[in-house]
Amino acid sequence: METRGERVHLPVFGVGTAYVVALFTTTALASVAVFFWLGWAAVNLNWLRLIFVVAGVIVAALAVVMWLVSVFGARVTENIENNQLITGGIYAWVRHPIYAAFLFLNAGILLVQANYVLLILPAVYWLALTVLMKRTEERWLRRQFGQQYVDYESCVNRIMPWPPR
């Protein structure tokens, strides 16, 4: 599909940018809410609080690694601009690793705060990302790449990384 000599491709900064901004804004507001209003839902057992904090740090660190591998390892900008479907490397483990990395980073930030109420937000983030991807990028990718993308999405998880099938 060509337009005036230029290839039609996904924007480098697409709907995901709005998702990421909303994600960080929600996480920041939730953090403020913990400080002012949600102290009653804090994890009070020291050993359990430690588990939350350690898990949060690990999840956030893995998210940063996932983002770095997704962006720099897969040369994502170059592939988008050249209208190439990326299916190797980390993209063999997860279809949307950049968005997943931001989701996991924010989940890690929420876990570190060790507050029971905040545990609902990663599920909300996952649901929002699923709906957003199904209604935008994945529709476009199916139209653009046809059966190649249909085969790819049948083998690779949308958000949760999993070894290739």
Which role does the model predict for each range below?
Residues 1-88, 102-165:
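Membrane-anchoring alpha-helices and their flanking helix-loop junctions
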Residues 86-96:
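Short, amphipathic, aromatic/basic-enriched membrane-interface segments that mark the entry/exit
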Residues 99:
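Short active-site segment of divalent metal-dependent hydrolases/proteases
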